[in-house]
Regions:
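N-terminal export signals
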Residues: 2, 8-28
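Aromatic-residue-lined binding/catalytic grooves and analogous aromatic/hydrophobic interfacial grooves
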Residues: 36-465, 482-484, 515, 562-565, ...
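C-terminal capping/lid segments that line or modulate ligand- or cofactor-binding pockets
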Residues: 61-84, 88, 108, 128-129, ...
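Surface-exposed beta-strand/loop patches in extracellular or lumenal glycoproteins
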Residues: 205-213, 753-767, 871-882
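Ser/Thr/Gly/Pro-rich low-complexity, disordered linker/stalk segments of secreted
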Residues: 810-841
């Protein structure tokens, strides 16, 4: 595939990225009588497999990784090629991206935007707000390790497999009567890539191995069984390349001989060989590049040399499977799975292949485990896999869709730990972004625009049409709260609170009052990458910014309460949030993308940013905001289904949230086409961009379980194409691990394990018929209520598992969570308040309830429990309309305690209020398992 430099891509984007970038799709033809090989069957079909080698096609090679080290494995008979990456090898070196001309020109830029002089505003942004340099730097490869194994003649029974259950690529074939097998895996515990070659006839393995690289490198042979590649990253954008790296490959043989000289490793007549690859980098962090890269490479290699292959393999498996095995999924299998993976993709449009959806789902989880681990860099636009010095969009971090999308499946598919690199990056950005905030806006806090790189560039890049977007850092910082909703980890929140606060502080300092509408708005900003008039995207207060800022300011305020600090800041954050522009329905019945009802010149643009409120956020919901919900559907109809890989993936998530199973599944199918999925299942923008893989995994999870609305909604968008199946180990906000088994499109059995005490609200079609609920831990039947026909509510206890099932359904072992909750999950919230055995109740007599704050988009309530309560162990607040319909349920928010008084605050209702005057709402608080039912009525007046 042709490499795409940033500038080429920008030219293409200017012309409308979709059309300009589409390559010719590849093809693959069905094999008559094909059957899945034993390795794929042993993996329960969770394997990519092929009957041909990758040749020179990088998009046929198979990825392995341990978060830091990555390799693409080609599996050619004559030459094995491992294309190597290390996740800190970035072009250039530390730089300060802030442009000191910005702040002095900001007032004039804003004036031009408010005067609708968008083009003139963009000109001034070009002159004064662009980063230094005006583009960011690229993630670059280490090079290749090639094993020249001899001619490929006389070969039969060739297969190549990437087993997702073992994170191992295996290549095996028969050549001249000898069965050769190669296994490759990247070990996180031992920090090496392991290539194991075996043959079933003694002394049959002979090869020469060498490194090569597009970087500036020197090869050598440091000892008789090792070769080395010492290099430095490339110069770019006027910044001198400064990341030094050392790659070592060392052979351990049984039988035969091994020698190394002049950078060539020679193995002759061996019976088995283990090649260990170790890579060290001098990158310490975004501002320091003087690490002992040679020492790091050698130390890891020497340590791995003392470990035999069996132990290397078993440690790798234990480490990997502890993550991967948390989620099991079965969507059914047809004979389509007996074709090689590339054939399955090529035939997908005409085949019934439900297992491919399961494979795609698990591949995303595999890729996240392999590219993002505690202590590594976050997964970039290509995860960690890149063979080019000038990769598309620099293989960096694009924040206006791609980087957040990479992490959508992290919590929902039970890979909480894999999320951590993002929070490390956010803390870095809170430093580099603070300089940009000061220099370009004269503001406190920190800001990051639409991209960042290994050096944590935070300024405007690429040009105003793309780069002049203020809310990149805001989106990333809001993920801190989102992650907390899953884990309940107060220590995590405390550690990351300063970055969250700083992101909010920037907007408290910079939002400006719209001259005619009176709302507080960002200016200048854009609705990502979409021109509202020809060639201009810059505007004030685009809808996505307002949605992101509602989440950010809420998150910062709520976090400040959990952490117990900053009351003044909190009040300011809330007051500011209340003055953000509400979402509006435009003339076409759509969600308006900008403050004005403009019609975008490019109607089918890939970004649908203004539906951020539908997904990933929860500001547009079916039951909470019915009008906006319908407008969201209309918005998607107007934009159409087509788009880049990541755009399709986001649309799976959108349609899942719209509970439209057929459409969500159509989008899954649209993604599984040869122009959107490479033979190795890498998602194609095109070109390759990994966000589509992660977005697809997230979308499939959203089709099976949603938890954004204060309840666990089971099978909200189950397509007819998956009539029977099971999934287990999915995670829901509030700290739940969930399994479900279904047949005929309906749940037979739901199993939920609670991390914390609380009130569990389950929504499923199952509850419209006969069902039973059991506390699996002791076989008892917990008390339940039925707030809606398809909703069951019950009090749950930390560590216990609950099962709801149709009467007579035999428990399905695979839907019961088998692995413990992620280690980051704390027992209760907050840890400073020890659980108590007395179950005091916030009954109507003991509690007072009042609306504390209201605004056009919602309001907050407060319940104060004044007698008999010693501690809160779990609580929820439910808002209902006067007719009893539940409109919102809240688990997040804050409670505090002073003596015997317990206060639950900020139990926000975030839906739309019916227009005009006063609306009566019911406010139901459940604290320590008791509830004030019937609800206390509160009246809210729309302002
Ligand atoms: C944004 C998108 C492009 C591409 C790039 C990396 O600019 O609009 O489609 O995904 O990021």
């Amino acid at each position: 595939m042709t490499d795409m430099t940033r500038r080429n891509v920008l030219k293409a984007s200017a012309a409308g990225a979709g059309a300009a970038l589409v390559p010719t799709a590849w093809t693959a033809v069905a094999r008559a009588g094909s059957q899945a090989p034993p390795q794929a069957l042993a993996a329960g079909d969770l394997a990519l497999w092929y009957d041909e080698a990758a040749g020179t096609d990088w998009l046929r090679a198979l990825p392995i990784g341990n978060g830091r080290l990555g390799a693409m494995v080609f599996g050619n008979v004559d030459t094995e090629r491992l294309q190597l990456n290390e996740d800190t090898i970035w072009a250039g070196g530390p730089y300060d991206s802030a442009n000191s001309r910005g702040a002095a020109n900001l007032a004039e830029i804003r004036r031009r935007v408010f005067a609708d002089q968008w083009s003139q505003a963009q000109d001034l942004i070009n002159q004064t707000m662009m980063g230094t340099p005006g583009g960011q730097l690229a993630y670059q490869p280490v090079g290749n390790l090639r094993l020249a194994l001899g001619a490929a003649s006389g070969v039969s029974q060739y297969t190549r497999t990437l087993d997702l259950t073992t994170a191992t690529v295996t290549t095996t074939y028969l050549q001249n009567g000898v069965r050769y097998t190669r296994e490759v895996f990247a070990s996180a515990p031992d920090q090496v890539i392991v290539l194991r070659l075996t043959a079933d006839r003694a002394n049959s393995i002979t090869f020469n191995a060498t490194f090569d690289s597009p970087q500036r490198t020197t090869g050598s042979s440091p000892d008789a069984a090792t070769i080395a590649l010492d290099g430095i990253s490339g110069n770019m954008e006027g910044v001198t390349g400064s990341v030094r790296f050392l790659a070592l490959a060392h052979a351990v043989t049984t039988g035969g001989t091994v020698s190394s000289s002049g950078g060539t490793l020679r193995v002759s007549g061996a019976t088995s060989v283990t090649v260990l690859v170790s890579i060290g980098s001098s990158y310490v962090n975004y501002r320091t590049v003087n690490g002992d890269y040679q020492g790091a490479a050698r130390t890891r290699l020497n340590a791995a040399r003392t470990v035999g292959i069996d132990q290397l393999r078993s440690r790798h498996l234990a480490d990997y499977q502890a993550l991967f095995d948390r989620v099991r999924i079965n969507l059914g299998r047809t004979a389509a799975a007996d074709q090689p993976t590339d054939v399955r993709i090529a035939q997908h449009a005409s085949a019934n292949d439900p297992q491919f959806s399961a494979l795609l789902f698990q591949y995303g989880r595999y890729l996240l485990i392999s590219s993002s681990r505690p202590g590594t860099q976050p997964a970039n636009l290509q995860g960690i896999w890149n063979d080019s010095m000038t990769p598309p969009w620099d293989s960096k971090y694009t924040i206006n869709a791609n980087l957040p999308m990479n992490y959508w499946p992290a919590d929902t598919t039970n890979l909480s730990e894999c999320f951590r690199p993002v929070f490390d990056m956010v803390r870095d950005l809170s430093v580099t972004g603070a300089r940009v905030a000061q220099a370009q806006y004269g503001a406190g806090g920190w800001v990051t625009h639409h991209n960042t790189d290994g050096w944590r560039g935070a300024s405007v890049v690429d040009g105003p049409l793309w780069g002049m977007w203020q809310t990149g850092g805001a989106w990333l910082a809001s993920l801190i709260w989102e992650h907390y909703l899953f884990t309940g980890d107060v220590e995590f929140l405390r550690t990351n609170y300063p970055a969250l606060k700083g992101a909010a502080q920037f907007f408290l300092d910079t939002l400006v009052t719209h001259p005619t509408l009176g709302y507080l708005v960002t200016n200048p900003s854009n609705s990502p990458e979409l021109a509202h008039h020809t060639d201009v995207s810059v505007c004030a207060g685009p809808t996505m910014d307002n949605q992101i800022l509602r989440d950010l300011l809420d998150a910062a305020a709520r976090a400040s309460e959990v952490v117990g600090v900053d009351a003044t800041f909190r009040a300011q954050a809330r007051a500011t949030r209340d003055r953000l522009p509400p979402m509006r329905v435009g003339s076409r019945g759509n969600i308006q993308e900008w403050l004005a009802d403009w019609i975008e010149p490019e109607r089918t643009h890939r970004h649908v940013s203004h539906l951020y409120g539908l997904h990933p956020s929860n500001q547009i919901t079916r039951r909470g905001t019915p009008q906006l919900y319908e407008a969201a559907r209309r918005t998607l109809e107007l934009r159409g289904d087509d788009g880049t890989g990541w755009s399709l993936a986001w649309k799976i998530n959108f349609w899942a949230r719209l509970e439209d199973a057929a459409r969500a599944h159509k989008l899954v199918r649209d993604l599984v086409r040869t122009d959107r999925l490479a033979p190795n299942m890498f998602d194609l923008h095109p070109p390759f961009q990994i966000d589509g893989n992660f977005g697809a995994t997230s979308g499939i999870a959203e089709m099976l379980l949603q938890s954004h609305n204060g309840e666990l909604h089971l099978l909200p968008a189950l397509p007819t194409a998956w009539p029977t199946g099971q999934v287990s180990g999915l995670r829901g906000r509030g700290g739940y691990t969930v399994g479900v088994a279904w047949s005929s499109g309906q749940a037979d059995e739901i199993v939920v394990r609670a991390d914390r005490d609380g009130t569990l609200r389950l929504r499923a079609r199952l509850f419209t018929g006969a069902f039973t609920v059991t506390d699996v831990s002791d076989g008892s039947t917990p008390a339940t209520t039925r707030p809606e026909t398809d909703v069951v509510q019950l009090t749950v206890r930390s560590g216990r598992t609950y099962r709801a099932a149709r009467p007579g359904v035999t428990p399905t072992p695979t839907v019961t969570p088998t692995t413990p909750a992620p280690p980051t999950t704390p027992p209760t919230t907050p840890p400073t308040t020890p659980p108590t055995t007395s179950p005091p109740a916030p009954s109507g007599a003991r509690a007072t309830y009042r609306v504390t704050n209201s605004w056009s988009g919602g309001f907050q309530g407060e319940v104060t429990v004044t007698a008999g309560t010693t501690a809160i162990r779990g609580w929820t607040v439910t808002w209902t309309f006067a007719n009893g319909q539940v409109v919102n349920q809240v688990w997040s928010g804050v409670h505090s305690q002073s003596g015997a008084n317990v206060t639950v605050r900020n139990a926000d209702y975030n839906g739309a209020l019916p227009a005009g005057g006063a609306t009566t709402f019911g406010f139901i608080a459940t604290v320590n398992g008791s509830t004030n039912n019937p609800p206390t009525n509160l009246t809210c007046t729309t302002t």
